[in-house]
Amino acid sequence: MDNYFIMNKIENFRINYNLGALRRKNLSPSPINQFKLWFNELSPEYDFNAMVLSTYSKLDGVQNRVVLLKDIKRDGFVFYTNYNSLKSRQIESNNNVSICFFWPDRQRQVRVNGKAYKISNQASIKYFKKRPRKS
């Protein structure tokens, strides 16, 4: 299939999302608990913990990248990054961030807006010690 065909047909491509509507009465009063319920339904066969993290800085504007969720706490979501990375510097200058999970097999996305904070230095060191050196 060549690119010409794909680009001329892309406007007609549509998946019917029919798994059902989201009803407030069926949701947990706690957004974190609801997220955990949905998260536990997922299959670990793909990067089910992948999320798009969006940051902003005056210099770079909005930047999006995929990071991996590593923990869910009572007060938020945990991911790790190098403190010298662009995303870390952007969060340092403006900690208003957005994350988005997309789970196509569940026909669901979860969007979260909030403030990012550094976890303890001890927790960060513990995590990075478990990782392969060049990862």
Regions found by a protein language model. Give the residues of each.
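Binding-site signature for planar aromatic cofactors or substrates
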Residues: 2-135
